[in-house]
């Protein structure tokens, strides 16, 4: 399966996960990466929160261009949404990171990897408010 098809499949998986939760709905922005205008992969909400989510998936480390993060910030601010990066690595559940918790690459770009999402990310259930995980210092 091509990485583009896999990414689209996982975006749809996350889309359906939100719809299965009572009170949550959303939409997938088709072709979000092919426009010059800021557009996240998913926009979801529950009447009190709106999330703009850029999805990343794969086997290991994923690099994220500074421009993509900047566009997510712009969109979220204009739309009144919280900006999040959703990450689904092979054999791992979805994890979500706030933009300030992304890893910094050389230059001005960012990255996510499995170690980073486990240490700095939150799981789907925490994102939607089912529980709040306490972290040990």
Task: Describe each PLM feature range.
Residues 59-70:
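Active-site-adjacent loop/helix micro-motif of nuclease/hydrolase catalytic cores
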Residues 5-9, 82, 88-137:
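Domain-level recognition of nuclease-like catalytic cores that cleave nucleotide substrates
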Residues 42-44, 48-59:
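Conserved catalytic cores of phosphodiester-cleaving nucleases, focusing on short active-site segments
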Residues 74-81:
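Arginine/glycine-rich "motif VI" loop of SF2 helicases in the C-terminal RecA-like domain
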Residues 25-47:
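Active-site metal-binding core of divalent-cation-utilizing nuclease and nuclease-like domains
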Residues 1-31:
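Acidic-basic catalytic patches of nuclease active cores, encompassing PD-(D/E)XK
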Residues 14, 38, 68-72:
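Amphipathic alpha-helical interface surfaces
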């Amino acid at each position: 399966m091509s990485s583009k098809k896999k990414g689209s499949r996982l975006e749809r998986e996350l889309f359906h996960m939100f719809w299965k939760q009572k009170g949550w709905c959303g939409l997938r922005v088709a072709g979000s990466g092919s426009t010059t205008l800021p557009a996240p992969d998913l926009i979801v909400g529950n009447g009190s929160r709106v999330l703009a989510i850029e999805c990343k998936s794969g086997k290991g480390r994923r690099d994220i261009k500074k421009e993509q993060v900047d566009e997510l910030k712009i969109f979220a601010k204009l739309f009144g949404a919280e900006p999040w990066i959703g990450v689904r690595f092979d054999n791992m559940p979805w994890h979500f990171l706030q933009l300030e918790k992304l890893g910094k690459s050389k230059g001005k770009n960012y990255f996510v990897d499995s170690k980073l999402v486990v240490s700095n990310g939150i799981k789907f259930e925490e994102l939607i408010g089912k529980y709040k995980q306490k972290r040990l210092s």
